[in-house]
Amino acid sequence: MTRHGKNCTAGAVYTYYEKKKDTVASGYGTQTVRLSKDAVKDFDCCCLSLQPCKDPVVTSDGYIYEKESILEYILHQKKEIARQMKAYEKQKNSKKAEMEELNKAAKESKMKAFLDKEMTIVSKPLNPFTRKSDSGIDAAEPSCSQQSSEEKNKQLPSFWIPSLTPEAKTSLVKKPDKTVYCPMSGRPLKMKDLMPVNFTRVDEKVDRVGLINRQDRYVCAVTRDMLGNSVPCAVLRPSGAVVTMECVEKLIKKDMIDPISGDKLSERDIIMLQRGGTGFSGSGVLLQAKEARPVMQA
């Protein structure tokens, strides 16, 4: 292959490399990016505010939140559900009123047709073998097709008004789900499921402001090992203490007793924390972000 042949600017085949390059440049298709360490939160940071927690709580799935942030999130979701429920009830009542109006109009039209038929004077006896139009009863009345065509002409679409275009359809409000879901796991979330977390500081003399500036802030409550994104750790439900998974496997699971409070433990009481990751692919954390965008098909 010659030197200019490597450019491949006049090839007859649209290669996979060229397709991926054009996808990134044009913005079409699924965009994928590899996250670096700067885009990964620390293990003790809130999943909503991405800041070190002052009053941390943890869910049963191991996601840490600031208590104030998660309570504000739950309150906001409940207000949004109430707003959607109000709109749904309004739509339901309007449809009910519309059906009542239609039924009332149908009854009135039947009654009017019956009265017109009873009050009509027939000059000659009706012949069952002749059509109704031949008897002269409905000769003066317009036909149903003419009435429907006139009504249809009144409702012709207007292409310059968005709400009157042929493709415009009234959007129906679906009945909202009253359950509040966790923003990270997508599972139902309740306030009673949030458990407080008690981190053990490296130095008890250092205040919270000085602790935030440090990279190593907390240690294991039992072994005093340093905690970080590279160290798998868990929360003990009875005491809320944070310990390393190595301590859980080697020490705690032998007796299944909380070393801080002395309560009996079960497998459900050991909640593994969701770590932020170290930036390496082998840390067990998904480091690839995807965004679905419109696809251009040939």
UniProtKB/Swiss-Prot annotation:
It comes from Xenopus laevis (African clawed frog). E3 ubiquitin-protein ligase that is essential for proper development of the forebrain, the eye, and the face. Negatively regulates nitric oxide production by inducing nitric oxide synthase translocation to actin cytoskeleton and inhibiting its enzymatic activity. It catalyses: S-ubiquitinyl-[E2 ubiquitin-conjugating enzyme]-L-cysteine + [acceptor protein]-L-lysine = [E2 ubiquitin-conjugating enzyme]-L-cysteine + N(6)-ubiquitinyl-[acceptor protein]-L-lysine. The gene is nosip. Keywords: Cytoplasm, Developmental protein, Nucleus, Transferase, Ubl conjugation pathway. The keyword Cell wall biogenesis/degradation does not apply. It is found in: Cytoplasm; Nucleus. A motif (Nuclear localization signal) lies at residues 78-101. Its EC number is 2.3.2.27. Belongs to the NOSIP family. Transmembrane segments: none annotated. This is Nitric oxide synthase-interacting protein. CDD domains: RING-Ubox1_NOSIP, RING-Ubox2_NOSIP. PANTHER family: ENOS INTERACTING PROTEIN, NITRIC OXIDE SYNTHASE-INTERACTING PROTEIN. Residues 132-156 are annotated as: Disordered. GO terms for molecular function: ubiquitin protein ligase activity.
